[in-house]
Amino acid sequence: GRYKNQDIICYPDASGRAMKTSAATGTTDFSILRNAGFKVLARSKQPPLVDSVNAVNALLKDAKGNTRLYFNKEKTPRTIASVETTTWKEGFTTGMDNAIIDKSKGVEHFSDGVRYICEFLYPIGKHKPQIIRDRTWSF
């Protein structure tokens, strides 16, 4: 196949360590991914939601106006739509420690995935960056 000798890296949220969707098999979601040959990189616990949203925003455009995160319009239209339409739950703002993403529209799944990889590689907050070299990302 086209990607035969390539590593596929997954950046899921920390809840995959728990026996949730895979409880019937007695393994974790992470174990299922690893057993299928995927490399799994995730934090031991979720960072504050605001930090992960800020990590994405900083890659989309930092304080100096630099952009390091791009989306291919032809290949990722649902991801773009998700990032553009995911909002904070009413009554919560980005400055609040207990901010919540509004999941009532059902559009946040793709933007959640973008948050997980961006926060893991380019964290805002307590965690140290997991990158070895600086690069521009595109989806």
Predicted features along the sequence, with ranges:
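Phosphate-handling catalytic cores of nucleic-acid transaction enzymes
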Residues: I132
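Acidic, Mg2+-coordinating catalytic module of metal-dependent nucleases/exonucleases
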Residues: S104-K126
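Mg2+-dependent endonuclease catalytic cores in nucleic-acid-processing enzymes, primarily RNase H-like
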Residues: G1-A99, I124-G125, T136-F139
